Amino acid sequence: MSNLENLTSKIIEDANKEAEELLSEAKKEENKIVDEKVKKGNKAKEQIIEKSKREAKTKAERIISNTHLKIRNNKLEAKQEMINKVFDEAVIKLQNLSKDEYLDFVKSSILSLDIEGDEEIIISPNDKDKMDVNFMLTLNNKLKAKGKKGLLKISNENRNIKGGFILYKNGIEINNSFEALVDSLRDELEQEIIEALFS
């Protein structure tokens, strides 16, 4: 073999070796890039899954919280309805007083008030027939005995009240209607009623 052939053969052999090394390096670099991309992809996938889990948990907590709030509000509404019913029934019971019981209520209420004794009594149209002249005479005599004027009279004005009465003089009213009396007791009795109904 001539030196030229040896040299050519050596150059080709070196070129092949270098090409193989370059290919091997390129393959390694390719694998490295693919591995990095896979790792990044997996990391991104985990982050997306984690974010989705957090969002789902937050949404579930919000739904549960809203549901608890609705349940609480529904319970409060139901309790309030029952309490209102108790007070409405109290007014109805007062409306169903007999004539004598009603007149006793009016008499004792008026005699317990600090009045001058010349006011007008405003009543419901339903109660007009219960108060007669004899009742007014008796009531005025009792007021006189207490040092009052004893000049109470039934007003020509009617009010849409469910019972009881309103005393009127010079633009000032003392409201002793059944609904006003029950409402005035509501604040102090409501807690007792809640305990009686719901404990």
From Swiss-Prot:
Q: Give the keywords, sorted.
A: ATP synthesis, Hydrogen ion transport, Ion transport, Transport
Q: Does the keyword Glycoprotein apply?
A: no
Spell out the SUPFAM superfamilies in the cross-references. Answer: V-type ATPase subunit E-like
Keyword field contains Ion transport: yes
Highest taxon, organism lineage = Bacteria
Stored Gene3D superfamilies: ATP synthase, E subunit, C-terminal, F1F0 ATP synthase subunit B, membrane domain
GO BP terms? proton motive force-driven plasma membrane ATP synthesis
Q: Which Pfam families match?
A: vATP-synt_E
CC terms in the record's Gene Ontology section: proton-transporting two-sector ATPase complex, catalytic domain
GO molecular function annotation: ATP binding; proton-transporting ATP synthase activity, rotational mechanism; proton-transporting ATPase activity, rotational mechanism
InterPro entries tied to this protein: ATPase_E_C (IPR038495), ATPase_V1_Esu (IPR002842)
Q: What does this protein do?
A: Produces ATP from ADP in the presence of a proton gradient across the membrane.
Give the family this protein belongs to, as stated in its UniProt record. Belongs to the V-ATPase E subunit family.
UniProt name for this protein: V-type ATP synthase subunit E
User: What organism does the UniProt record list as the source?
Assistant: Clostridium botulinum (strain Hall / ATCC 3502 / NCTC 13319 / Type A)
